[in-house]
């Protein structure tokens, strides 16, 4: 995803 927030509150940019 783009800009998806994860379970631990981290923002990913997969």
Curated annotation (Swiss-Prot):
Keyword Nuclease: no
pH dependence statement: Optimum pH is 7.
EC number: 3.2.1.14
Thermal activity profile: Optimum temperature is 35 degrees Celsius.
Superkingdom of the source species: Bacteria
Catalytic activity: Random endo-hydrolysis of N-acetyl-beta-D-glucosaminide (1->4)-beta-linkages in chitin and chitodextrins
Annotated keywords: Hydrolase
Keyword flag Hydrolase: yes
GO MF annotation: an example: endochitinase activity
Protein task: Has endochitinase activity.
Name the UniProt record assigns to this protein: Endochitinase
Species for this entry: Glutamicibacter uratoxydans
């Amino acid at each position: 995803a783009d800009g998806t927030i994860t379970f631990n509150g981290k923002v990913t940019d997969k």
